[in-house]
Amino acid sequence: MIDATPSHAVLREFFDNSSLTWGLMACGIAQLSKLFLELLLHRRWRPAVLIETGGMPSSHSALVTGTAACVGWTLGFDHPLFALAAMVAFVVMYDASGIRRAAGLTAERVNALPDSLWPYAPEKPLKESLGHSRLQVLVGSLMGPAIALPGLEFVGSPLHLSLIHISEPTRPS
């Protein structure tokens, strides 16, 4: 049977997913903090850090740990979906501090090679900031639940905040 649910209801359910919303909020705040750290530590305003990978803190770690924490908080930490979310979080964090970091270090060394070694001139240097140090992953993984759980507990779904004055039409009795 075909589901006749209106598409706006599906979109509303998607945007009303508190675990997803607060995981994304944790990711966004972690990414935004990179801009302020750049300003504080290097005394320069460089908005490009908002779309770059790597650096302090790991926004991907904040995303997956924030989402996993919300799933555990709402469904229970013994729920199979929390186990899945936690395993995905571990894989993402391992990848960020292991494989992606190694790829970035390799790119750094390749970029340091003299141009005379190449049969043709490279168009642009390889991207070096790919992964994270363990500290960057740790800070991101702590930021995730620290942002997502209070948001989930005290605010709930941000969609509910925007719809406080909007209610479903009621029919007169």
What are these regions (language model features)?
Residues 22-38:
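N-terminal signal-anchor/start-transfer transmembrane helix
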Residues 38, 42, 46:
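Helix-loop segments that flank and shape redox-cofactor active sites
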Residues 28, 32, 47-163:
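Membrane-embedded catalytic cores of phosphoryl/pyrophosphoryl-handling enzymes
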Residues 13, 112, 168:
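Charged/polar, solvent-exposed surface patches and flexible loops
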